[in-house]
């Protein structure tokens, strides 16, 4: 399915966030918000590949840049993007919040802090690519508090050799979550999703396929 790229500026306090939308050439229903990790920007290959894949299957996709290591700042920026889409001209029925590494932490925090009065079903789920559950070699300090408060569906896509998300620890955290959840492991992938002996595009294809399938499952259920 063809789509159109639209560059825009999203209001964030007295600043503007750089963003790019991929808009499918069809009537819109659902969208996905994506942002990068502690480094990089919205043009990270992981994100551009995923956005193109989702848009080619009919899902509106917005990527945005918010640089910096201050997680509170990143969370506020993400919330501004979400609020922008709620009232935008695209008139989406719902969105999925997503991100890579630190970006997925910000998305998770936004979702778990949505006020009851805002629970209008606009946010349909959370996509965590390489969720940074802990610092390398600091498995005793888990970033799991927000995950336990989420009630909407969550998809984790992580590498089985991720130095910031030990496999058995994420599985234990997931078992305690109240939200419906799924974990897809990219075998032998590290935090950057690099796998020795596999091409980057091959890994991207696996990630993109899993995320699209999960989103389609939820949106198809909504139609019933």
From Swiss-Prot:
**Highest rank taxon of the organism:** Eukaryota
The record's listing under InterPro entries reads: AB_hydrolase_fold, KANL3/Tex30_Abhydrolase, NSL3/Tex30
Query: What protein is this chain from?
Result: Testis-expressed protein 30
